[in-house]
From Swiss-Prot:
Its cofactor is [4Fe-4S] cluster. It is an enzyme of class 2 (transferase). Pathway: Protein modification; protein lipoylation via endogenous pathway; protein N(6)-(lipoyl)lysine from octanoyl-[acyl-carrier-protein]: step 2/2. This is Lipoyl synthase. The gene is lipA.
Length: 298
């Protein structure tokens, strides 16, 4: 193991525990809910589950795209379960979550990429758990505006789509069908829609990007109106995935946060263990929406 791949101390985390965590874990196991928290072995699982948030995955566990940073299985996915949105909403209601993030594999085998399935899940969640904030982390749907509209019209509170990396590294890091500028167009289209959605994206560092490229990415994201940005350390999930080119220090993450904030994001979460679905960012969104609700009342 080389210096570039040996994990530093700041990436070591304690084993998850706590009453809230154990309660959510039991419900997840009983309902057979597919959570990204477990699938991706997220280091923040105890903080999130214990604090009333979770990230769940729709449309199966087999993806039609092969991104070189991602540990999800690739292949021909099974048919969609039409009851999945209902079962998801029932499980989330039982967990009494304050914030739910719904994401999915890519389903390029579906005519609409799974957009209508996402929309069904959003509507069921909002019906069963009206006080739960619903964030969706969506694929690019090949940039098809009709499919993006299907998701937007279901009115999630937050819609996220990840650019993942800087423009130069996109062909190396992401599946060849994923395009940097297409992702920007997706985010711009969603932001400009009449639903008034908050938009969010995530960038991994440690893949070989330069500071200048990161700054250009921050600028590109603000140019299309992205509200919330999360920055985190890329970690190699297996020997078959892209290697870590560098481990970014906590101090450098703070510098990136300051730089990104200068471009006008509503919120930037930046740190070694920050992930796309990150408790601090969700806490910010919850507070923002509560302030908006009070303003409407008052």
């Amino acid at each position: 193991m080389t210096e570039t791949t040996r994990k530093p101390e700041w990436l070591k985390v304690r084993l998850p525990h706590g009453e809230g965590y154990e309660r959510v874990k039991a419900i997840v196991k009983r309902t057979k809910l597919a959570t990204v928290c477990e699938e991706a072995r997220c280091p923040n699982i105890a903080e999130c589950w214990g604090g009333g948030t979770a990230t769940v995955m729709l449309m199966g566990e087999v993806c039609t795209r092969a991104c070189r940073f991602c540990h999800v299985k690739v292949g021909a996915p099974p048919p969609l379960d039409p009851m999945e949105p209902i079962h998801l909403a029932q499980a989330v209601k039982e967990m009494d979550l304050e914030y739910i993030v719904v994401t999915s594999v890519n389903r390029d085998d579906r005519p609409d990429g799974g957009a209508s399935h996402f929309a069904s899940a959003i509507r069921e969640l909002r019906r069963e758990s009206p006080r739960t904030i619903v964030e969706v982390l969506i694929p690019d749907f090949k940039g098809v505006e009709k499919d993006l509209t299907t998701v937007a019209e279901a009115k999630p509170h937050v819609v996220a789509h990840n650019v993942e990396t800087v423009e130069r590294l996109t062909p190396t890091v992401r599946d060849r069908r994923a395009k940097y500028h297409q992702s920007l167009r997706v985010l711009e289209y969603l932001k400009n829609r009449p639903e008034g959605l908050y938009t969010k994206t995530s960038v991994m560092v440690g893949l070989g990007e330069t500071d200048a490229e990161l700054e250009q990415t921050f600028k590109d994201l603000r140019d299309v109106g992205v509200d919330v940005l999360t920055l985190g350390q890329y970690l190699q999930p297996s020997q078959y995935h892209l290697r870590v080119e560098r481990f970014v220090t906590p101090a450098q993450f703070e510098a990136y946060k300051t730089l990104a904030e200068s471009y006008g994001f509503l919120y930037v979460a930046s740190g070694p263990l920050v992930r796309s679905s990150y408790r601090a960012a969700e806490f910010f969104m919850k507070g923002l929406m509560e302030r908006e609700r009070l303003e409407r009342l008052g």
